[in-house]
Amino acid sequence: MPLNKDIKKVLVIGSGPIIIGQAAEFDYSGTQACQALKEEGIEVVLVNSNPATIMTDKEIADKVYLEPLTVEFVEKVIEKERPDSLLAGMGGQTGLNLAVELYEKGILDKYNVKVIGTSIESIKEGEDRELFRDMMNRINQPVIQSEIITDLDAGIAFARKIGYPVIVRPAYTLGGTGGGIANNEEELIETLTSGLQLSTIGQVLLEKSVKGWKEIEYEVMRDSFGNCITVCNMENIDPVGIHTGDSIVVAPSQTLSDKEYQMLRSASIDIINAVGIEGGCNVQFALNPHSFEYAVIEINPRVSRSSALASKATGYPIAKVAAKIALGYGLDEIKNAVTGMTYACFEPSLDYVVVKIPKWPFDKFQGADRVLGTKMMATGEIMAIGSNFEAAFLKGIRSLEIGKYSLEHKKFKDLSMYELRERVVSPDDERIFALAEMLRRGYRIDMVSKITGIDIFFLEKFRWLVEEEQKLKQSTIDDLNREWLLKLKRRGFSDKAIADMLKVSPDEIYRLRDIWHIKPSYKMVDTCGGEFEALSPYYYSTYEQYDEVVVSDNKKVVVIGSGPIRIGQGIEFDYASVHCVMALRKQGIETIVINNNPETVSTDFSISDKLYFEPLTEEDVLNIIDKEKPDGVILQFGGQTAIKLAKFLKEKNIPTLGTTSDQIDLAEDREQFDDLLERLNIARPKGKGVWSLEEGLEEARRLGFPILVRPSFVLGGQGMEITHDEEELTYYLTNAFEKDSKNPILIDKYLMGREIEVDAISDGEDVLVPGIMEHLERAGVHSGDSITMYPAQNISDKIKEDVLDYTKKLALSIGIKGMINIQFIEFEGKLYVIEVNPRASRTVPYISKVSGVPIVDIATRIMLGEKLKDLGYGTGVYKEPELVSVKVPVFSTQKLPNVEVSLGPEMRSTGEVLGVGRNVFEALYKGFVGASMYTGDKGKTILATIKKHDKKEFMELAKDLDKLGYNFIATTGTAKELREAGIDAKEVRRIGEESPNIMDLIKNKEIDLVVNTPTKANDSKRDGFHIRRAAIERNIGVMTSLDTLKALVELQKEGAHNRELEVFNLI
């Protein structure tokens, strides 16, 4: 039992939906913490709104509440469950803010709930900018000259006093939200206004900019006895001025002298002791590169993105140790699971280099401002491990899945030196490639360091890589000898990079490696630099001599993970991968995971029998398969990243379990799939693949507008658009064929019907459909961005029968063994198939949780040869539950400057929440609250700007809203039509007209909800785009689909928002 015998039932607060700044790392830390508590025999009650997480599984906690993370709903859970303790530091900023609010409102006192781990007072000292600054002054730790600001005038006065540039840092926000660097008064007014609005306590720290200093982080652990260690120190390659979540980070630090390292280590320990942290804490410093001057930037008094990275970089389980400390254990009492003999008080030592590179979503947002600053924009990250910096860095580049295997990028070749300089002075996500091009052209390293703030140490490494690339380009395959090839492999060059530069195929390099016996060896991540024997089966590749992998003769299966979190391929695929691993291990099969995402549960070495932290490229995967010789490889759960390897593995005669490469092609190749549908007599929207602009226009004339256009072989609707006329189609096709002329563009007649979705399991003979899901928004909104209801609410029995019939026919005809995801449209009483994915989809965690069917477990067992009829869940459509569950998407567009907000066929959401109720209205209300959507609870003024062919439908909704007490503001045309319909509407001037116009009303927050149906999506020159952006940046609700507005109307008419709602334990 824990040292504190009073702790028997602990409430753990999760972090909610995946958003920029708060991603899968909190599923990893939350899962680890829950397991650590259960190990001690403590009952765990978990509240989290995100259904796509492992931590919300019944195996992880004793009670699981998928409820909105608000004081109101968490109080209901506390009232029902009566926990004696609350663990606050595992749910990111969301969990921390919620714990503070519960404490301040007296709810924790009311129910006698004690906060364990870091106290609320310590959390406040770490989070409140003023308290933290005062504390630093008391313990003589230097902070940057700054002032706490709560109004605009005081901010302007302070900036004038200290001079520009200044940094704006709002209190209690996430990922630098609302902050930024202001170079002049105009920029300050804009950033400060936003920061004060977005801070939960209306407080901002305004500080003198030390942009260009080094940014160094220490991950520190402290127990309640005052024992303290540094787990890991990390160096941002990018200087202060770029958010650490958007920086390339290396561990351990590479450029600090011993004196600097010890100075900052001592400072971090002094800080964590002064604040009184009990558990994990991240301390960030700015270090002057030309002296020993430093300043404390901030601390995170909780587990964080950096602590997930530090855990994976060192093998030290920070969240688990923090949870044990919260129970009263000392660091010297907690065993290190990696060695099995040392304790958590041993500081890890690393004999390798770790590099983290962020993954940005700009492929989804063509018009986005890509310049990096103090506001985080990355959706995810990769981590790479190497025996030297260059090897880890190049592994990192190829892990990003951006089609790059070296530091060469074609788009920078034609830029002038002036243009390249601009790209690194205002750094963006591609700055490394611009910088490499400058070095390639002989730009002086000291000058590059001066303008970028990047240390000369790293620039010299980049220059060496660039020089080797140039040598290769000037050589032929005959010039390559064993010594040179081994040197390149040791420095991280992939076969593909070497082959591209020598203009041969990667197979040719692989053949030479085979002849010359140049094979990777695998080293263990052991936390102790090889000082003690390690038990952790956690490996990275190197081309050094000694290999630490012991290959067994057991039956074994490799599971390919899904790589970094990105829009369209999120945490749902990690959920599926982890469940696949669990199912295999239950069957006694040795399970090997290959993945490169430091945030996820799948890369926790305790999950699988072996973990290879490697890029998911053909070469890196093949090297491991060559080594392990598994009985099979599973690709179905790793999203498109894994599926893309199917053809390659087939060519190499490597067995894949479940659906084969040919079957995947049958589902994804347009012509083959159309032939199959014709044979099965299943309808699909009319259309075809076209290879040229002329052919596309001809097909569009035949089908009639509107037309849905998209590239083949994509994920998350990437590049998909609805075009309404020939001008729009010409613009789209011209751009699409410029990007990719080797594949056709798919053109479909756009049907505006109801969208229906199923995830099904097939064993080749029978099919099980765990549930039929209905999308609230009509077709044309990407399925990942639609509100999804289960059980389906508006589908006739006849259509349900057709859904099952079509699903069976498709699964059996394709030959699916395992999972299949199918999307349908019901249009004018007829069912059409619009998409088939022969793999796990992003709805798998949702439908698994709400139907009670362990989908991944069943699918995995089928891949191993079992039959559906023997697994206890039957066949056909599974019985529907009594409760209604609604999945609501969550967007991070507020954090990305100048990107589109409206819903459309390209996916834009980063996460999701669940709403569970006795009926669909209760579920929707909870979903809206959990997703921080507009619910009408706080204000009832609507700005309506509606396109012509939506006006009739809008008027019907406006009548209902009028009866519900809403006020309308509209531009001349819409206002006139509202008045003609008997609805009072205030007229407002358009953008660009004299004040007060639409923008003034939005800026002054005189509007509570913007209803705007876009005329031309993705056109940032139009007024609608500016209205949507201005609203979202000021936390004003925006709805761009009338279906979403209709849902709001219905739940208000039903009174779901005024009812006393229950909370439900889903176990």
From Swiss-Prot:
Mn(2+) 4 binds at residues 835, 837. Gene3D superfamilies: 3.40.50.20, ATP-grasp fold, A domain, ATP-grasp fold, B domain, Carbamoyl-phosphate synthetase, large subunit oligomerisation domain, Methylglyoxal synthase-like domain. Residues 1-401 are annotated as: Carboxyphosphate synthetic domain. Coiled coil: none annotated. Mg(2+) 3 binds at residues 823, 835. Mg(2+) 1 binds at residues 284, 298. Binds 4 Mg(2+) or Mn(2+) ions per subunit. InterPro entries: ATP-grasp, ATP_grasp_subdomain_1, CarbamoylP_synth_lsu, CarbamoylP_synth_lsu_oligo, CarbamoylP_synth_lsu_oligo_sf, CbamoylP_synth_lsu-like_ATP-bd, CbamoylP_synth_lsu_CPSase_dom, MGS-like_dom. Mn(2+) 2 binds at residues 298, 300. Mg(2+) 4 binds at residues 835, 837. Mn(2+) 3 binds at residues 823, 835. Belongs to the CarB family. NCBIfam families: CPSaseII_lrg, PRK05294.1, PRK12815.1. Composed of two chains; the small (or glutamine) chain promotes the hydrolysis of glutamine to ammonia, which is used by the large (or ammonia) chain to synthesize carbamoyl phosphate. Tetramer of heterodimers (alpha,beta)4. This is Carbamoyl phosphate synthase large chain. It comes from Clostridium perfringens (strain 13 / Type A). The gene is carB.
